[in-house]
Every structure is written in C-alpha cells, then in structure tokens.
Amino acid sequence: MNIQEAKETIEKALRAYFARDEIGFPLVPLRQQRPILLIGPPGIGKTAIMEQIAEECGVGLVAYTMTHHTRQSAMGLPEICTRGIEGKMVHTTEYTMSEIIASIYDCMEQTGKKRGILFLDEINCVSETLAPVMLQLLQDKKFGNQHIPDDWLIVAAGNPPEYNKSVREFDVATLDRVRKIEVLPELSVWLSYAEKNQIHSAVTTYLMAHSDHFYSVSHEADEKRFVTARGWEDLSAVLKSYEILHFPVDEALIGQYLQEEKTAEEFSSYYRIYAVSYTHLRAHETTLHLV
C-alpha cells in the first residue's frame, strides 16, 4: 500500500485499540492488540505520518531510532538486589526502568495525554545484542520485565533487505504477532502532500513530467545511488531559501539531495529553464502592475 493508505490503517488501529465497550473493557483485548510493523524503503514518510497521526488523533508520540540505542538503554541497567526466598536472603539481578518506557511516562506527564504511540524506527537493523530485546517487545509488548503502558500503540518501522545490508529478517513466530504493512512510494500521493505543504513548484512540475525520477535506489559496486521523497522535500526547502537570498543554484547543490547523477543532472537543467521563465514572468507581472 502507499503511505497515505498506511496512515489511514494505523489511525483505524489506534481508534480500534483505544475503543471501549459499555462496561469499559477494550473492544480489542490487550493481548490481541498487535503492534504494527511498517516495512518500506527509506525516505518515503514513515516518521512523518506518525507525527501527523499523533497530532490529528490528539495522542502522545514517543519516537526512537533504534540503531542509536544499546541493550542497556532499551532494557535498563542491571543492579544487585537482596530478597528473601524460602527463608533465605539471596542476591538477585533486577533492572532499572528502560529509558524508552521512562520516556513514555515523561510524555504522559508533560502533555497530559495518557494515550499515545511508541514509534521505533529501524527496528530490523539493530545490533546483535539488541535484536532479542526487540523481538521480545514485538511478541510480548515489554522490555525485560517492564510492560509498555496500556493505551499505547507500538508501531515499528524498518527497511526491506534490498535497501539495507544490516537488515535482520524476523522469524515466523514474531511476524505472527504483528500487523505487517508493506509500504511503497507513490508519486500521486506525494504530490497531494506537496500541494498541502507548499513544495517548490519546480519540483512538482518536474516530477509530473518525469514520474520515474521520483524514487530510486540502486547499488553499483560499492556506490549507492538514490533519490527519495525526503530528498525532494529537503531540496524544495533549500531552493526557496537560495532564491530569497539570491544564491546561485547549481548541479553540485542539487546532487547533494538527489544522489543519483542522471536525475540530478536533468533536474538541474530543468531548474535553469524554470528559473529564467519564472524571472521573466515576475518581471512581466511587475510591469503590468506599474501600468
């Protein structure tokens, strides 16, 4: 499905999981509230839709990129405790609260929102020591012996293996406990987003004429070449700022965002023509206004 369909699917899951019957019990029992696993190429807007959903549904959002974390930050730090077992005092290992779970409680306290989304990006690219912790989260909704609070939807995201050599495949036991959604880039959906978010018209008109340049990822030898939706959006922002500041826009700048040589070259040529036409149009409008 495309990113808009994925957003709508997650919104429905959120509302279904949080809904209660007339007695106050969840319509979907807690143990059957499966985490959602988004699998899709990088830069198509997975993180962006989570922010939109949280804002539109009025819930909290705690987001983490899991490749930046260790087993200790996810599970908490071990500490030695003393407890009585069968009349004897023994030392046991317990864990401090997970940094991630603590962040959920911080979010609830700071925003006053008791319901929310825990979004964990790059979940299938974590280190070998952290991988079992992530599997436990998806299977049991907990880190170590600490459960994710009720009324918090777990959404995890990752890239398919063809986009990232670090990807770890999930086993059937894990996939059987999640709602897996495969997301693909779709230009028409992105153009609707672009219109609402005032993406530079040079970008949108170019992509309308060159739809095959919207998204691509390839590997040649040790070189990665790619163009993503994120790249186009960020390029749009820098084009606007350069125009205001009267800075020149060249192929080198464009290539920093569109990291595929042919696309960068062709858009650079298109933008030069666009810039000249736009300048002439503005000059003509100014002349008419003065008359």
Segments from the language model and where they lie:
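AAA+ P-loop NTPase catalytic core and its hallmark functional loops
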Residues: 2-205
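Alpha-helix boundary/capping residues
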Residues: 13, 17, 78-81, 197-198, ...
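Non-catalytic, well-ordered alpha-helical scaffold segments
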Residues: 132, 229-233, 261, 265
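Single, functionally critical "micro-switch" positions that shape active/binding sites
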Residues: 158, 227, 283
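Conserved AAA+ ATPase small/helical "lid" subdomain
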Residues: 198-254
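Charge-dense polyanion-binding interfaces
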Residues: 247-278
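Conserved small/polar residues in nucleotide/adenosyl-binding loops
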Residues: 279-286
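Cytosolic catalytic cores of cyclic-nucleotide second-messenger enzymes
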Residues: 290
